[in-house]
């Protein structure tokens, strides 16, 4: 298997090459040249399923005995044996908890694996990588946790100043490691993401620092997330049984992993895109139109995004892998801030996708009512997913098909939202009990590409190698 660019103007790569480069040479995203077929007959054991699924993408590039060891090691730090518990909330509505990793967010599932893969590949090659990433809250801490203390890696994470929760920020900025560098950017997450993309698009700079990516622009992230869709289906009967998934999403990586699972043969008749008031994705899946607007701060800040990087992977599929058409659409979108796909394109996804969006008041009510009815406390992003699942079920669409809603973060990561709903803050796990007393280490920078590039150079140890 090879990996190809969504614009079609960059060389094909092996899995290992795509892992280390992150973005293609033409500045965009990798996808598999063909979708493999799932042949899974497991019982929902996470580690076994993870190896079976991901070996479809890695077998030609990685020694599989070694890869199995990397998988087993990646999930040792999770708090529960099943890795992703599945809980029935209502009749035929389930919650899959993805937040039992070291930083309490679903990003740990992919990034604990990616950190191990980076380490293996770089040690094998005797190379060094400078990781640069942007975060709307959870990716940063998960990436830092996965990469801290690794001799062949430096990691620089950009987050939007004052636009992540305090717990999210402190999980990043209290890490004191020689290879970890946090930067607060005076702007939005979209600004942070644009800075990262601009650095990758400067090929001379990229090669000089040997830049690597941990955001979901890196295919390995998406690959690792396919696994829990398969696991959910297995635990509900088999991977042939139809299951609808409700996915709170901002950057489209998590829900695209569900689409990838479907492309590999998993029976997912519909994916529900769950958004907050920053509902550009909901607009697209309901009307086939995208229109950039101002980012509105909400109680679910990880979804306060207007430009969703991973949507390009989906558009590439819609346009039957015509890179030129993809390029033209996104260039128009960047220039005009508005784009609509034709009716024949919309027809390709209108029956298999649906979009829902909710405001903060609805989210607060959901957290409150769920805690009262079941004792389960949802974080605001997971509440958006549950709201979408119930809204879909209320329409009596596919009533016999189970809906799995993905719980993406521990409620303690968003204490203000939970306190507003319940009148008290959820406690942090014991290992993070002193988080608010730990010293912070970060640099404040303007939204200025040259300033940020110079700072990344100062952080990288590449010249010491």
Regions found by a protein language model. Name each.
Residues 1-465:
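PLP-dependent amino-acid enzyme catalytic core
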């Amino acid at each position: 298997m090879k990996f190809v660019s969504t614009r079609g103007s960059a060389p094909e790569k092996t899995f290992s090459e795509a892992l280390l480069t992150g973005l293609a040479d033409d500045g965009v995203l990798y996808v598999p040249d063909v979708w493999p077929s799932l042949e899974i007959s497991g019982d929902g054991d996470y580690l076994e399923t993870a190896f079976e699924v991901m070996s479809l993408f890695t077998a030609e590039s990685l020694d599989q005995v070694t890869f199995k060891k990397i998988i087993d090691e990646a999930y040792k730090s999770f708090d529960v044996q099943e890795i992703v518990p599945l809980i029935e909330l209502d009749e035929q509505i389930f919650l899959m908890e993805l937040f039992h990793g070291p930083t309490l967010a679903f990003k740990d599932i992919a990034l604990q694996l990616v950190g191990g893969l980076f380490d293996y590949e770089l040690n094998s090659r005797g190379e060094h990588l400078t990781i640069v990433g942007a975060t709307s809250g959870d990716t940063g801490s998960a990436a830092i946790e996965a990469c801290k203390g690794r001799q062949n890696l430096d990691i620089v994470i950009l987050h939007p100043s004052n636009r992540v929760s305090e717990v999210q920020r402190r999980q990043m900025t209290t890490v004191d490691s020689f290879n970890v560098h946090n930067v607060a950017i005076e702007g939005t997450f979209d600004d942070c993401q644009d800075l990262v993309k601009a650095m990758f698009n400067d090929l001379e700079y990229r090669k000089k620092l040997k830049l690597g990516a941990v955001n979901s622009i890196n295919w390995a992230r998406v690959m690792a997330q396919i696994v829990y869709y398969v696991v959910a289906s297995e635990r509900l009967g088999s991977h042939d049984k139809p299951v609808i998934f409700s996915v709170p999403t901002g950057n489209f990586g998590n829900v695209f992993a569900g689409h990838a699972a479907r492309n590999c043969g998993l029976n997912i008749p519909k994916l529900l895109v769950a958004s907050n008031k920053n509902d550009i994705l909901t607009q697209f899946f309901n009307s086939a139109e995208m229109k950039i607007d101002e980012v509105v701060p909400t109680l679910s800040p990880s979804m306060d995004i207007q430009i969703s990087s991973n949507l390009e992977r989906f558009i590439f599929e819609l346009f039957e892998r015509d890179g030129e058409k993809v390029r033209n659409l996104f260039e128009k979108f960047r220039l005009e801030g508005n784009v609509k796909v034709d009716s024949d394109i919309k027809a390709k996804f209108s029956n298999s996708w649906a979009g829902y969006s909710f405001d903060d008041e609805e989210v607060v009510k959901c957290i409150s009512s769920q805690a009262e009815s079941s004792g389960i406390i949802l974080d605001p992003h997971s509440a958006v997913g549950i709201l979408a699942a119930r809204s879909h079920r209320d329409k009596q669409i596919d009533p016999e098909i189970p809906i799995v809603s993905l719980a993406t973060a521990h409620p303690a990561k968003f204490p203000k939202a939970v306190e507003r709903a319940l009148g008290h803050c959820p406690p942090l796990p014991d290992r993070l009990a002193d988080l608010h007393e730990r010293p912070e280490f970060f640099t404040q920078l303007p939204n200025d590409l040259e300033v940020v590039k110079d700072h990344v150079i100062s952080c990288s140890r590449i010249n010491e190698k």
